[in-house]
């Protein structure tokens, strides 16, 4: 996997190829939310486009996966590569706010996300869905997406659905809540490492 293109630009390019998926991603943390996403899973494209737009992170992502089997490998591996790219683009994390949280409504649904970019991978997910599949996307993969992302981003991510019935609304609210929480956490608020340890 590549290193950040330039520390000051907070960008990264990462690729990963296995017998199940072939993924490449370019991102810029300090972008405007422009995106070109082709994951092979249409509903995931929609969620990642929302993430890019609301986090204001520029993303170009392509994935060729074994979706003839199911969506599991593509969704999981995209999360792993996205987490790696986000981590690399953060560099030494000097000056970042580190913590972020958001609460986002979408009609009857209400999602909350809180996260810590302090280097400790952990994921807590509290949400249930009325449908098992949305347009080829297995709803059980929402939790697995954020678990996989937390591992390679080295982040602590807590996600909860507080209200809601419609499965699409709940999932979209989750991705948007994560977007705003991450946007908050990666924002520059100082010059040093935000930890008494001196490293995160």
From Swiss-Prot:
Q: List the disulfide bonds.
A: none
Root EC class: lyase
Gene Ontology, cellular component aspect? cytoplasm
| GO molecular-function term, one example from the UniProt record | imidazoleglycerol-phosphate dehydratase activity
Provide this UniProt record's keywords sorted from A to Z.
Amino-acid biosynthesis, Cytoplasm, Histidine biosynthesis, Lyase
The Enzyme Commission number assigned here is: 4.2.1.19
- Location of the protein in the cell: Cytoplasm
- Enumerate the catalysed reactions: D-erythro-1-(imidazol-4-yl)glycerol 3-phosphate = 3-(imidazol-4-yl)-2-oxopropyl phosphate + H2O
- Its pathway? Amino-acid biosynthesis; L-histidine biosynthesis; L-histidine from 5-phospho-alpha-D-ribose 1-diphosphate: step 6/9
Please, one GO biological process term?
A: L-histidine biosynthetic process
Q: Which Pfam families match?
A: IGPD (PF00475)
Q: Which HAMAP family match?
A: HisB
- What's this protein's family per the entry? Belongs to the imidazoleglycerol-phosphate dehydratase family.
Q: What is this protein called?
A: Imidazoleglycerol-phosphate dehydratase
Encoding gene, per UniProt annotation = hisB
């Amino acid at each position: 996997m590549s290193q950040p293109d330039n520390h000051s630009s907070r960008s990264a390019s990462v690729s990963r190829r296995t017998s199940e998926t072939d993924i490449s991603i370019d991102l810029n943390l300090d972008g405007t939310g422009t995106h070109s996403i082709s994951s092979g899973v249409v509903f995931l494209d929609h969620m990642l486009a929302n993430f890019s737009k609301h986090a204001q992170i520029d993303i170009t992502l392509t994935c060729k996966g074994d979706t003839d089997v199911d969506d599991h490998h593509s969704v999981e591996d995209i999360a792993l590569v996205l987490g790696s790219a986000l981590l690399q683009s953060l560099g030494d994390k000097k000056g970042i706010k580190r913590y972020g949280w958001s609460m986002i409504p979408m009609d009857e649904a209400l999602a909350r996300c809180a996260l810590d970019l302090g280097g400790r991978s952990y994921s807590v997910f509290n949400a249930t869905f009325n449908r098992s599949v949305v347009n080829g996307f297995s709803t059980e993969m929402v939790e697995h997406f954020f678990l996989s992302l937390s591992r390679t981003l080295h982040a602590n991510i807590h996600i909860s659905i507080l209200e809601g019935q419609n499965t699409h609304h709940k999932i979209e609210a989750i991705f948007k809540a994560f977007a705003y929480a991450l946007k908050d956490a990666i924002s520059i608020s100082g010059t040093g490492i935000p930890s008494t340890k001196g490293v995160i």
